[in-house]
């Protein structure tokens, strides 16, 4: 009798095990802020292919800013197309928009979206123009019966009211609050999905702010915009970001028990750990075979760091406009350094990839002070606040209180009350708050062209890496 009972218990246990939900693993591979760095794409291809060889359920995701940052992509016959062609071939599944997707205008972006073989989702862009398609707010991907929902959002904080960029790029488009849209579509999509992912180009600070509200129903946030390496858990949601420039790939492992999420893990994997895929390497080399971009146009007599490059650009806009003072925003300096020796056109376009124009006006020291203090204390763009953002040809000192709020700006070489001729980038002119001036205008002179001309005419250039601006606490 006992033997029969034991056999019955074993049979019941076996039946229970057979009926238990099957455990499976879903892998989300993610990139963000690739900024046209196709030189690293062959290593990305190797990493993705290695994962697909070992994992059955894989989704490849990008969180925006696919171009702007590499002349071989940005100045291709169709700007941006080398990156999109490589992404199509590798088989990206879904992406959202970044602010730099709009750099060439919305009509161009609309045409580029038609060239993308992957789904582009964005819940907080509303189009009222025929030049730009109305994008879906989300998509649902099925992997072996597991339904994964992806909601996309893009920043609207820097515009204000739209992503950072020229106002003309956003005519006819509205950008509702990305956090509100993320919450709205999470509530709508959650009942339909086993896994819910927010693909965000708001920045990790805004992502964390959203999750801290405690209303999120997302399992994972795949983030971008702020170029940070992020791996943190907030309110049960995993918040991730891989940095920038295809230096890393994000690997999110979602353990599923039946149709329930049993656990989520994340790793940032350096792509330097992978050998380049040979076929992708050949394609990239073909894109780089451009003698017009490769040939040095001049020389640096010494290595330039980021401060030195910013000093050079501020001086260049001032010289071109015959101004007394030049300002350049540090966010527009897109390289961290350039070594001594030959400097190619590609390097200059990598330093200044936006087609930035020179703007000129007249300002008093009081008006310059107001501009600098406003930017330093910026309550909206927290990542750009409380740092020296405006590099200038004239020295100045920002005086702060104990809480690091700017109180004053001292100009040792300027005379109070006098009007000075001032030159800035058109990005500053169009977008910075509390700008007061007289006689302002945007010229047709491009910053990159000015830098190239200087290299051709005055090489070797000696770059001054000495910071002219500093912050002191009162």
Regions found by a protein language model. Give the residues of each.
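Acidic, metal/ion-coordinating pockets
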Residues: 20-275, 305-316, 326, 362, ...
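C-terminal motif of bacterial Sec signal peptides marking the signal peptidase cleavage site
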Residues: 15-18
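Catalytic centers of hydrolytic enzymes
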Residues: 24, 31, 37, 169-171, ...
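Sec-dependent signal peptide recognition
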Residues: 2-10
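N-terminal leader/targeting segments
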Residues: 10-12, 202
């Amino acid at each position: 009798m006992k033997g029969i009972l034991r056999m019955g218990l074993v049979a019941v246990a076996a039946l229970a095990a057979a009926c238990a939900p099957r455990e499976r693993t879903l892998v989300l591979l993610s990139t963000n802020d690739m900024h046209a760095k196709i030189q690293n794409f062959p290593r990305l291809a190797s990493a993705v292919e290695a994962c697909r060889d070992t994992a059955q359920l894989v989704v490849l995701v990008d969180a925006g800013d696919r171009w702007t940052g590499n002349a071989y992509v940005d100045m291709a016959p169709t700007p941006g197309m080398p990156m999109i062609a490589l992404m199509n071939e590798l088989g990206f599944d879904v992406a959202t928009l970044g602010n730099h997707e709009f750099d060439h205008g919305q009509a161009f972006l609309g045409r580029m979206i038609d060239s993308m073989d992957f789904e582009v989702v964005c819940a907080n862009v509303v189009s009222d123009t025929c030049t730009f398609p109305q994008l879906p707010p989300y998509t649902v991907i099925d992997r072996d019966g597991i339904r994964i929902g992806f909601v996309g959002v893009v920043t609207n904080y820097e515009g204000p009211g739209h992503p950072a960029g020229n106002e003309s790029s956003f005519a006819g488009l509205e950008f509702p609050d990305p956090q509100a849209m993320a919450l709205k579509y999470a509530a709508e999509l959650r009942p339909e999905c086993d896994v819910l992912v927010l693909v965000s180009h708001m920045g990790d600070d805004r992502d964390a702010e959203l999750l801290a509200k405690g209303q999120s129903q997302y399992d994972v946030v795949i983030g971008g915009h702020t170029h940070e390496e992020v791996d943190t858990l907030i309110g049960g949601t995993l918040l991730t970001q891989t940095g920038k420039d295809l230096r890393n790939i994000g690997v999110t492992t979602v353990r599923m028990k039946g149709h329930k999420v049993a656990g989520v893990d994340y790793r940032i994997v350096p792509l330097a750990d992978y050998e380049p895929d040979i076929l992708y390497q050949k394609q990239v080399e073909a894109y780089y075979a451009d003698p017009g971009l490769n040939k040095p146009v001049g020389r640096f007599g010494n290595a330039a760091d980021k401060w030195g490059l910013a000093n050079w650009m501020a001086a260049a806009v001032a010289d071109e406009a015959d101004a007394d003072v030049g300002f350049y925003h540090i966010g527009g300096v897109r390289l961290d350094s350039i070594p001594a020796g030959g400097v190619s056109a590609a390097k200059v376009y990598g330093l200044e990839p936006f087609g930035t124009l020179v703007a000129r006006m007249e300002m008093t020291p009081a008006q310059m002070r107001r501009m600098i203090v406003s930017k330093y204390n910026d309550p909206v763009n927290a990542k750009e606040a409380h740092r020296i953002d405006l590099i200038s040809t004239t020295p100045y000192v920002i005086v702060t209180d104990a809480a690091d709020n700017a109180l004053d700006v001292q100009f040792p070489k300027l005379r109070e009350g006098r009007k000075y001729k001032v030159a800035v980038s058109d990005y500053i002119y169009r977008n910075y708050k509390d700008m007061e001036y007289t006689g302002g205008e945007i010229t047709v002179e491009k910053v990159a062209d000015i830098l190239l001309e200087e290299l051709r005419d005055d090489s070797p250039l000696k770059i001054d890496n000495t910071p002219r601006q500093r912050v002191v606490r009162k």
